[in-house]
Amino acid sequence: MQDYKLPAGLRDNFGPQATQKESVRHYLTGLFQRHHYTLIETSLLEYRDVFGPYELQAESLYRILEADGQDLVLRPDLTLPIARFLVTTNVSLPTSFAYVGEQFRRNRQLTGLYNQSTQAGIELVGFQSRRAELECLTVISELNRDLFNGRLLVELGQARLADLVLADLPANERQKEAIKAALFNKNVPDYEAAIAPFKRERHYPFLAEWTWLFGKADVVEKMVAPLWVNPAAREAMQEVLDLAKLVAQLGDQELLVDFSTAAPQAYYTGVTFKAYADQTSTYLVSGGRYDNLLANFQEKSEPAIGLGIDVTLIAQLLERSAPRDQAKPTLVFCQLADWPTFAKRYGGDPAYEACLADSLVAARTQAAATGQQLKVMNEEGDLIDA
């Protein structure tokens, strides 16, 4: 007999998991509508070239070969399809989009990670003002409050900071890449070895402290104040610190700044943000500014900022923390001729569930198996003990 298993890395959702995921999706759609974003659904299949700016190896993509030889992929990302949409339509800018959809990305085997996930997010295109960053962080704050009671940890960073700091360091590209790799991977021994040749440079005091430049904004601000960096790097850091002060006023949530973190993707150009839950080291929300994104598809670029929300992971965390002793609906058995009466009287009441068994004996068996109370509806529509 053939084994009809799912391909590795994919899964089915049912029962409480599927219910929780749909609940999160419904909440996010309502959140987006309250912020007056335009909902968008892009195609699940795209040409491979759409994801040229995306840092992903070919073996990580689900690929489909068209009859004409064109290379299609199941989308591994939902931001770049929106960029493709913008340059192939006449949508006027600025505009604010929101989406919920599936993405597919092959992970290494034996990592325990799934290759399919549901992502929601927003894309604010054509907005240069820092108000766009605050809009994204307000959405994160509302999600944090509504779904996690403020328990999410929000982290701010700067995508270009490493390149700005190292821009005028007298080092070759190989040395600069070694510094960045060790910094982003939090590999302190390799990092110290990478910066050792530059002890005589005025950059060195900052380089020596760089791996420690994370924490609460006021603490980090005091740490960087006496350290020399070039004006462009100083301005980039101050932008993040100023933004952190405004975000801190949004409500009760833990907020950190990390100047030693990598951008989520290579196309990011400014402030970045992530949100973590205490139950996982994987971020639930990530995003930031990417003002050069449309330049990959057309000559003219547009300022843009956005965030992605991992619906699948959020649903998993909420489902795990949900109380297990929730009351089950009462199972109601009735004769076939009395079904219209049941539907009118009890059909819209979540406290009751129609029993689809053919007989009262089968209904009792079903109730025993599911742990539900069983009632019988008589001809008058009253419920009596079974």
UniProtKB/Swiss-Prot annotation:
GO cellular component: cytoplasm
UniProt subcellular location: Cytoplasm
SUPFAM superfamilies xrefs: Class II aaRS and biotin synthetases
Single GO MF annotation: transferase activity
Keywords, comma-separated and alphabetical: Amino-acid biosynthesis, Cytoplasm, Histidine biosynthesis
GO biological process, one term: L-histidine biosynthetic process
The protein's annotated pathway: Amino-acid biosynthesis; L-histidine biosynthesis; L-histidine from 5-phospho-alpha-D-ribose 1-diphosphate: step 1/9
One Pfam family in the UniProt entry: tRNA-synt_His
Family annotation (Gene3D superfamilies): Bira Bifunctional Protein, Domain 2
This protein's record includes keyword Amino-acid biosynthesis: yes
Cell membrane recorded as keyword: no
Anything else known: This function is generally fulfilled by the C-terminal part of HisG, which is missing in some bacteria such as this one.
Record-stated family: Belongs to the class-II aminoacyl-tRNA synthetase family. HisZ subfamily.
Function: Required for the first step of histidine biosynthesis. May allow the feedback regulation of ATP phosphoribosyltransferase activity by histidine.
Subunit and partners: Heteromultimer composed of HisG and HisZ subunits.
Name of the featured protein: ATP phosphoribosyltransferase regulatory subunit
Organism, scientific name: Limosilactobacillus fermentum (strain NBRC 3956 / LMG 18251) (Lactobacillus fermentum)
